[in-house]
Amino acid sequence: MEMRGIENKSDIALAEFRLTGINGPDKDSSGSTYPDAAAVEAKYEAERQIQLRAHETVSDIEITVDDGWTDLAQDPWAGCPDPAGETPHLLTQRSHLLSQHRHRVLIVGAGFGGLLFAVRLLQTGQFKASDIVIADTAAGFGGTWYWNRYPGLMCDTESYIYMPLLEETGYMPRDKYASGSEIRQHAERIARYWGLETRAMFRTSVRDLAWDEDKKIWNVAGRLLGDVMDTEQFRMAADIVLLASGSFASPRVPNYPDIAKYKGKLFHTARWDYQFTGGSLENPKLTGLADKRVGIIGTGASAVQIIPHLARYSRSLIVFQRTPAAVDARDNRPTDPVWWKEEMASQGAGWQQRRQKNFNAFTCNETPLPGNNCVGDGWTRMPSFSLLIGGPQNLAPDYIDQMRAVDLVRQAQIRERAHALVQDPVAADLLTPWYPGWCKRPCFHDDYLSALNEENVRLVDLRHGGLSHFTPSGVVANGEEYELDLIVLSTGYTVPVTRASPGSRGNISITGRNGMTMEAKWANGLATLHGVMTRDLPNLFFAGTSQAGACVNLTYSVDQNATHVAYILGKAFERRPPNCDKVVLQPTHEGEEQWAGEVLARAAAFRGIAGCTPGYLNGYGKSLDSLSPEQQVNMARLAAWGEGIASYVNRLEEWREKGELEGVEMTFLN
């Protein structure tokens, strides 16, 4: 492996930073390793300062087909027939659903969030599949798993708890950690099982939602998409709208200087082009890269899975890294059918939710912990991640110090692993993470670090000089030009920290009663009821983390939102008087302010994020110091439920057990 981009050895703050105990943890009398805490903390801060200086301040490109961004914006899978070869039928189905104009329920998003909303509504008995229409810009079900089909794609959360509705569908995942194609196929399975496959309007972009106070409906406007570009506008109406755009709906593309001048192949990881690289998700032999000079920008969770394949097949690979990933072992293995039958299916009804709750207990560091760690993976051995997602101990005065001590040992082990697997010691230094483990989503992979030993791979450190601009033939980083035939943008997504509201995450303009917009509600002191509905946006429900529960297993938290929304709607329709066909729901002012106050009182649970290196979890290093006290309070109102997902779910269940719909304002109309 040839190392490049580390010429700036004069920057002794990091390149030559050596303190006792930080590169090889000492051992105590019992043989356990422990690092020199003060030395490590000093290096963490030195690295953070370098990262803050190195972080790009360029804006993000909104990838549309306008201005020549066709390759970045288009759906590469839209022209591919589904397993039944029915892609043309999908457009006919869309036309049929649009011809009905008005629908009882519109769900925006056809990923697991949208599907769970639909399934939980159906289970109330108050809704039929024919009442529901699902809109998505994709040409199929799956959400982020529809778009992401890059080589090596897998889920980092155990499939037995991540893939929803396994118990209901009777499906056994093939492996402990499922591939992207298996997960996408499971989304299609759910749609078929509940009769939702004919209720989807694919290649449909909802752009505008406006509440009609006279008719008590949502007017919906947007565009119908073809294989490549926008084709025509549409309008429809819905009594109820559920937003399920997800946290990773919009690829993030930094607007690097002169990026439009690049003449080679350029695509984002969420828009992988197998026609150029060769291979497929199911058979990722990238034979088209045998004579290609490839560069990949970014070394986050997607890149960690992609880089081993690029290293194996490309003529040369340049890995542009600013912040190294913290990579632990994955240890994937096939599902043993005998074990599955004995340990899972034989446990009776509710086995999946019990396993999910067990996983949550360990990742949120509940006390006391369950006696049995069912999942038993890297996530459940990382209690410090509770500082990011919340937990029952987070508000204790000394909790951060406790978690820092635990995390120092874990991160030291992660760094030891990098040095053990990467042959070049200079490369190993660059690939070791010097930040608290909860500051960035940890990665789990068995081939990533060893792939960087390949002779055709170069690692370019962007912390000092950075990636300054594109050229027609490549990029310039640290003052050196790298000529590349293909550049892969592994630059992530716009996420809730930078696009806080559910509407903004889906690029939807939402206007409710009295001109109230969703963006204004989120910017000026958010108040919701349980994180799923807000006043002046009636009959609008959403999933997310603001004022709701957060956890590592995203499908579990979304399912809790969906279950709660379905309960509210189901009970409201049960209570409607005879001959009333419409119900209008919104929180009372007192109800949502009380809930917001409880969220605010727990917001300090996330104080451990302060001081993290820049990344999507903290708005790419955006400081709160420049905000006024009022603005800081408004930001705190956007927090998740600080006591952890179990506490949040318990509060919702207690509320539902009362059966009073407390805090919900209901209007019944003929």
Curated annotation (Swiss-Prot):
<dbReference type="GO" id="GO:0004497">
    <property type="term" value="F:monooxygenase activity"/>
</dbReference>
<feature type="binding site">
    <location>
        <begin position="156"/>
        <end position="157"/>
    </location>
    <ligand>
        <name>FAD</name>
    </ligand>
</feature>
<feature type="binding site">
    <location>
        <begin position="154"/>
        <end position="156"/>
    </location>
    <ligand>
        <name>NADP(+)</name>
    </ligand>
</feature>
<feature type="binding site">
    <location>
        <position position="162"/>
    </location>
    <ligand>
        <name>FAD</name>
    </ligand>
</feature>
<dbReference type="GO" id="GO:0016114">
    <property type="term" value="P:terpenoid biosynthetic process"/>
</dbReference>
<feature type="binding site">
    <location>
        <begin position="322"/>
        <end position="323"/>
    </location>
    <ligand>
        <name>NADP(+)</name>
    </ligand>
</feature>
<feature type="binding site">
    <location>
        <begin position="144"/>
        <end position="147"/>
    </location>
    <ligand>
        <name>FAD</name>
    </ligand>
</feature>
<feature type="site" description="Transition state stabilizer">
    <location>
        <position position="441"/>
    </location>
</feature>
<dbReference type="InterPro" id="IPR023753">
    <property type="entry name" value="FAD/NAD-binding_dom"/>
</dbReference>
<dbReference type="InterPro" id="IPR036188">
    <property type="entry name" value="FAD/NAD-bd_sf"/>
</dbReference>
<dbReference type="InterPro" id="IPR050775">
    <property type="entry name" value="FAD-binding_Monooxygenases"/>
</dbReference>
<keyword id="KW-0503">Monooxygenase</keyword>
<comment type="pathway">
    <text>Secondary metabolite biosynthesis; terpenoid biosynthesis.</text>
</comment>
<comment type="function">
    <text>FAD-binding monooxygenase; part of the gene cluster that mediates the biosynthesis of calidodehydroaustin, a fungal meroterpenoid. The first step of the pathway is the synthesis of 3,5-dimethylorsellinic acid by the polyketide synthase ausA. 3,5-dimethylorsellinic acid is then prenylated by the polyprenyl transferase ausN. Further epoxidation by the FAD-dependent monooxygenase ausM and cyclization by the probable terpene cyclase ausL lead to the formation of protoaustinoid A.</text>
</comment>
<keyword id="KW-0521">NADP</keyword>
<dbReference type="Pfam" id="PF07992">
    <property type="entry name" value="Pyr_redox_2"/>
</dbReference>
<keyword id="KW-0285">Flavoprotein</keyword>
<keyword id="KW-0274">FAD</keyword>
<protein>
    <recommendedName>
        <fullName>FAD-binding monooxygenase ausC</fullName>
        <ecNumber>1.14.13.-</ecNumber>
    </recommendedName>
</protein>
<feature type="binding site">
    <location>
        <begin position="299"/>
        <end position="305"/>
    </location>
    <ligand>
        <name>NADP(+)</name>
    </ligand>
</feature>
<keyword id="KW-0560">Oxidoreductase</keyword>
<comment type="similarity">
    <text>Belongs to the FAD-binding monooxygenase family.</text>
</comment>
